[in-house]
Amino acid sequence: MPKVRQSSRVSLRTLPSETSRSSRNGSRQPRHHDHIFGGYNKLGSYAKAFDEMFDNQGNVRGPYKGIFAELSPSDAEELEARAEALGRAFIDQGITFSLSGQERPFPLDLVPRVISAAEWSRLERGITQRVKALEMYLDDIYGDQEILRDGVIPRRLVTSCEHFHRQAAGINPPNGVRIHVAGIDLIRDAQGTFRVLEDNLRSPSGVSYVMENRRTMARVFPNLFATHRVRAVGDYSSHLLRALRNAAATNEADPTVVVLTPGPFNSAYFEHSLLARQMGVELVEGRDLFCRDNVVYMRTTEGERQVDVIYRRIDDDFLDPMQFRPDSVLGVAGLLNAARAGNVVISSAVGNGVGDDKLVYTYVPTIIEYYLGEKPLLANVDTMRCWLDDEREEVLDRIDELVIKPVEGSGGYGIVFGPDASEKELAAIRKKVIADPRGWIAQPVVQLSTVPTKVGDALAPRHVDLRPFAVNDGEDVWVLPGGLTRVALTEGSLVVNSSQGGGSKDTWVLASRTSGAARELGDAEVVRKLPKPAKAAPAEKGADSTSSQQQGQQQQQAVMR
């Protein structure tokens, strides 16, 4: 395996942030904002965060000047009309997520998040570097395990990870790619520095909202797209299809690709069906596939058809009842044996979870240096590992000022914010950390950056994160320009997950003046002359969560895992 040896041991601590300019430090100074930006007149705790539209003196930052000029003359009625137009468009298009068996619209805020061309170039390079290093790491872990033999990371880090699947040994992708799609979660700290919060290498969801957010915003704000060089996002599915077709065995000139879904009760089913439709491939459930002689076939109205690549949106544990959960009816019996025989490719690969485990995350800077011989271009959030004695003691001493996260948690569940926790909650999490040190990490409270967001009849700061999506086709790592910006709609909240009341924003990456990248075009205006509609609560479609064994086995993922 190609890698660069280091002359000295690399620190296992996460990297500190880059030194920031003094002009970016400190809380913002009060400045009166008129009209719809009145929500910025009482910042409260938001004054500690880096605001992406306004600098410390309240001046509008360069990438947002056009948006500010468009929105600032608006009154509350026009703001509400545009917001309702966005909401109606989502409901009309059936864009929902499932929460506790109920289909709910996914809130889209009307103020886009804007990233300059120069800033995006830095992020793109950092994401690409990270995906390449993690690809090499996974190939090594399920192969020669040189990184373990060299003592660069502890062997027990891998063997104790519940997503390290020995069943994946011997499954060698034809083009060497295990991470076909990655979602790298980023936050922007109080100094304005982007940091990696989490890696998602299994079935990262949310890209459908990126595309639908853009389509809807282009209808509601066509004039903004006409005056901004916003890079297009609609070609994601073509990049994904190319990656999946490239993943097939080299002797397959026209491989059959399918999208494997747990079914309509899964929280991300809308995304599964959208991607299948846009790629022009079949959307299948486990019952539509079967294995014979280590070959996977699809049942069709015209008979059996061999399947070459499966883009699965099912967790490993449900994928093959012969290898994992024997009670699963969501997967395909014999699928792993077929993959091991080289007759089908599973995308993303089985066992990728050993690369996005939250404890493994703390070693990714070391992994990058080991395999690539490069310094990480994107820093992690500073993280303490409770399984190391000295770091655990520090966590227990400072538990009331840290964020304590379960290593296996998702969707924002199980996180304890020390500063907001009661004595009873702190005592409970202390016991959990002591009982299972491997299961917990701790981080300082990071004031996520803020972007203006509609709150009532005004725009006010709300915290955001960002999930860019990277697609690896074996020749290149392509990063979708933008990604999913999630916003914590509840005042003061740092939790952006949709399952916890979060929403989303359209994410604009501006092209440079010399760029040849495709630009987004606005659709016909649908709002400016619209009368304000009467308010009515949209009916929600229920989902019977107990109708069958299969429903009971649906992985109840938050929309953005």
Where are these regions (language model features)?
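Preference for protein termini
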Residues: 1-561
